[in-house]
Amino acid sequence: MTKMDIRGAVDAAVPTNIIAAKAAEVRANKVNWQSYLQGQMISAEDCEFIQRFEMKRSSEDKQEMLQTEGSQCAKTFINLMTHISKEQTVQYILTMVDDMLQENHQRVSIFFDYAKRSKSTAWPYFLPMLNRQDPFTVHMAARIIAKLAAWGKELMEGSDLNYYFNWIKTQLSSQKLRGSGVAVETGTISSSDSSQYVQCVAGCLQLMLRVNEYRFAWVEADGVNCIMGVLSNKCGFQLQYQMIFSIWLLAFSPQMCEHLRRYNIIPVLSDILQESVKEKVTRIILAAFRNFLEKSTERETRQEYALAMIQCKVLKQLENLEQQKYDDEDISEDIKFLLEKLGESVQDLSSFDEYSSELKSGRLEWSPVHKSEKFWRENAVRLNEKNYELLKILTKLLEVSDDPQVLAVAAHDVGEYVRHYPRGKRVIEQLGGKQLVMNHMHHEDQQVRYNALLAVQKLMVHNWEYLGKQLQSEQPQTAAARS
């Protein structure tokens, strides 16, 4: 990976402001371990160890102690977490564990080694903490789990990993709901604090996705839709950056690049790039674009991503970005790389590639191919390729889009397809397209009504020449002016 990966990985492990501030407050409130010992809530062994551990101020002193007493350390921390219920003390224990791991990543091994002795895994010690009520406790536990999973030699697997990823998805989705204006139960947490806790969750995901095996598990858990949902809503630039960082990490795997084709990621990222005022957001989008073009091993996949970028006007954005000065040389290198690759793709661009890319982006407009008799004559049959992939997208747009221009162009294209492909009517009917077009004959927008009517008539009529003469008198002025 590039050096940016290392920077990002460090960013992901650093706590957000609210957690850092609360952790400082927690550290300052020392625990009276003797009172727990007198109350018989902890053992003399654990009490003695934790007091000695607290006295080790320097990292070197702690390391020396952990090398000889690592097992006791893990045992004591787990015993304390298990037997003490007071929230303030649990916060203190988790903060000590998190500090210890942050100081030296290799220390995660003490928990794995201890668990192995009892023929268990480290996860059951920390996963139940995610169900607690206190947000600081929950998010500290989440950070520790991510560090154990990302830095340990043993992978989190099966139901433990599913549970953790589902928890992350739920937290990120709560942010998505907040962005859409839906009321979300956040207890006494302010929206500012809440967004910082969500950034902490995103940081956990960033750490996890540095491990290739977790990338596949995240995708299988429908995690990409979760990321896209957050990005599609209004979220702060920091969370935006973290979500795109996660996409960038996923795109290091050639198999992932192949899989990510289905999520329409390029239009969303190009919109964010267009509006971005933060250099770090610009940088991570360009790096993600580069991964899509560089890590994909299949030529067809690379070409599809390149065409999507061209369709979304990324070339123009790159030319504008090229004029600016950057402190980060990665940005300049990525701009140069992308300009070169997209420039090559433009040279190879056929009218069908252009049409296919526009259709897959879901952003239909009256580009020249739609009105080109030659295009439809030569390419109508190609809409049947890959089990009618493009026709299915076309009919889906008629079903779900609320953009009048998209609906008008889609209805027009259905009509042109059936006009130029002899068995087109039957195919469109089987895909439910005929009914969808008919539904738009009474649309409030005149262009949608007109193109739906035209398409329905093409679905019904056999004499195209006669139909053409009939329609000239019906064509609305706006359409006449455009053509």
From Swiss-Prot:
It comes from the Eukaryota. Pfam families: V-ATPase_H_C, V-ATPase_H_N. CDD domains: VATPase_H. The modification Phosphoserine is found at residues 59, 483. Its main location: membrane. Coiled coil: none annotated. It is a peripheral membrane protein. GO terms for cellular component: ATPase complex; clathrin-coated vesicle membrane; presynapse; proton-transporting V-type ATPase complex; proton-transporting V-type ATPase, V1 domain; vacuolar proton-transporting V-type ATPase, V1 domain. It is found in: Cytoplasmic vesicle, Clathrin-coated vesicle membrane. One of its GO terms (molecular function) is proton-transporting ATPase activity, rotational mechanism. One of its GO terms (biological process) is synaptic vesicle lumen acidification. Keywords: Cytoplasmic vesicle, Hydrogen ion transport, Ion transport, Membrane, Phosphoprotein, Transport. Subunit of the V1 complex of vacuolar(H+)-ATPase (V-ATPase), a multisubunit enzyme composed of a peripheral complex (V1) that hydrolyzes ATP and a membrane integral complex (V0) that translocates protons. V-ATPase is responsible for acidifying and maintaining the pH of intracellular compartments and in some cell types, is targeted to the plasma membrane, where it is responsible for acidifying the extracellular environment. Subunit H is essential for V-ATPase activity, but not for the assembly of the complex. V-ATPase is a heteromultimeric enzyme made up of two complexes: the ATP-hydrolytic V1 complex and the proton translocation V0 complex. The V1 complex consists of three catalytic AB heterodimers that form a heterohexamer, three peripheral stalks each consisting of EG heterodimers, one central rotor including subunits D and F, and the regulatory subunits C and H. The proton translocation complex V0 consists of the proton transport subunit a, a ring of proteolipid subunits c9c'', rotary subunit d, subunits e and f, and the accessory subunits ATP6AP1/Ac45 and ATP6AP2/PRR. Interacts with AP2M1. Belongs to the V-ATPase H subunit family. This is V-type proton ATPase subunit H. It comes from Mus musculus (Mouse). The gene is Atp6v1h.
